Amino acid sequence: MNRKMKLKEFLTNEEYEGVIQNAIQYSDMSLPVWYLEITNKCLCELSNFDLIRCISQDVFKDLAAFEIIERIDEQNTPFYADIDSTEMMERLSSISPEILSAHKCKLDRMIENVERNNFIDFADVCMSDEEKEMYKGYVNIIKNKIK
């Protein structure tokens, strides 16, 4: 997948026109304006917040999941996003097994780093024991989805 393609290139002309009209009609609301703004960005330009929001809002969900997985793999740690790491893992765990399974090799590496290499104990992010357990729970959900 080309991470440099603008997100609007993944929309039909009609869908993109709808995004524009929504942003114009509801210009006082942040969500339609944000949606229009991200359509003019490529995946690699999206912030971690944008990726989390894409999954939460069910827009470009598969592309956002792909980008999160790519970033985790490139950085060789699921904690690259600092304070957003837990929320990103939570959102990633909500993705369908079909989408996650397409990235099985990279997710297996991530899971191994969390489970076997104890990356969670060496993360730059300070987590309480409860937060670590929650994080591991999200990892287990992903693990079960890609079996």
What are the functions of these language-model segments?
Residues 1-48:
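Long, low-complexity, highly charged intrinsically disordered regions
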Residues 49-147:
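Extended alpha-helical scaffolding segments
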